[in-house]
Amino acid sequence: MSAISRREFFKNAATSAAVAGFLSASARMLRADPLGLPIGCQTWPVRTMIAKDFPGTIKQLAQAGFQTIELCSPVGYADSGFAGLGKYTGAELRKILGDAVVTCVSSHFGIEELRKNQAGGIAWAKDVGLTQMIVPSLDGPQKPTMDDVKRAADEYNKMGEEAAKAGIQQGLHNEDFELTMVEGKRTYDLLFKLLDPKLVKFQFQVSTISQGYDAADYFTKYPGRFISMHVQGWSAKTRKTTAVGQDTLDWKRIFTTAKTGGIKNYFVEMNLELMKASVPYLRNLQV
């Protein structure tokens, strides 16, 4: 299957009308049934809104049915709309979340950001009350050697060790470098062997089904190695992103095996209109 990049998933961002529709989701959607986990939202798709009004955006996400969110670091994602988060103290940010009755235990951090100042990233995470620090990619070469993969894993194990000292779980998303091949083997699978299972957990991007990476297969193959997942609907017939429950994915199987994989939280990550349309299905899904 041909690769579908993250940028392609979000290039058709919702219009203001779609935003309005997204924000009008009813209060009856505030409960989630899959594994007893709250319905989560990655804030990347609403980064423009966050840049303009973070407190208002969080309240609106809560009204739409999301009970927990995943942020992006104000340093590593400063150019993407998250720089403004840096103006809040941890107490202020926690109050904004608390007032909206929304929790946040996870955030994305750029690998280069952590290379330059991991201590600063950890300090911000602790101040905000996070327990998970996720890196989207180790940013290795697109045609890596086995040594490239080993070096990347060694470096990230050390970062995981530093995070663990602070009581934070380091995590790794699967994008770009993680989806390459090395000597006929998937780099992603090699990383499961090279990364310390205690120091680094994995966050699965469900949309990588478009590249042949099946979430349920990985949760079963590597029990206990995951901590979270990014949820996107995907139609094999149209090869397009769809609302969860309006696609061809077996979500009952995905969530059932997610328990085996160790999933502690999940975050819907699509354009606003599709995120809104996914909430009722997730609320009613029984596994």
Spans of model-derived segments:
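Glycine-rich, proline-tolerant flexible connector loops at the mouths of alpha/beta enzymes
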Residues: 70-92
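Flexible loop residues that form catalytic
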Residues: 44, 74, 112, 138, ...
